[in-house]
């Protein structure tokens, strides 16, 4: 897709981002969330993410067509060089390279933050169904992620038990002389 602009999300984007996210909650097991958050709750999520991590949107013209962000992996200081990724693309804009562009930008920022390991927590169907396919796993594999763990039947949605896999991508070297994690706001000052 041409003319895609990637920029930092703002809490003011919450309503547009929620329009992208809501169908994932309502129709899929891609997220194990049951209830669509309010706009206020979504604004808070964006604000909380931006305190330490990037939250990016992809725009075509003035329409947001996707977003991706990273967040804390486990939430302890020893894990600062690891981050969890999330990505959501507008239903009508999938398979157009937007996700790949968003993740490329996320990886570039993560490297600048001295993040070395990226992780994705992905719903995994024993058998594909109308709510969950292998598309997310395949997308992440295409970008170099490897499956490193599988939790069986750990999430239940739409009266179905789903597995969850952790996928990992190393984007840096595990040197002894590791640099400190740099919070996202310090990169954009």
Question: Could you describe each region identified by the protein language model?
Answer:
Residues 18, 22-45:
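Conserved GNAT-fold acetyl-CoA-binding loop/helix
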Residues 110-132:
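Conserved GNAT acetyl-CoA-binding A-motif
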Residues 87-92, 96, 124-126:
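Active-site acidic-Proline motif in GNAT/NAT acetyltransferases
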Residues 5-17:
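A short beta-loop-alpha structural element at the N-terminal edge
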Residues 37-82, 86-92, 109, 113, ...:
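Acetyl-CoA-dependent GNAT
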Residues 121-123, 137, 141-160, 172-173, ...:
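Conserved catalytic-core motifs of GNAT/GCN5-like acyltransferases
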Residues 95-111, 134-138:
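Conserved acetyl-CoA-binding loop-helix of GNAT-fold acetyltransferases
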Residues 2-4, 63-67, 162:
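Glycine-rich phosphate/pyrophosphate-binding loop shared by adenosine-nucleotide-utilizing enzymes
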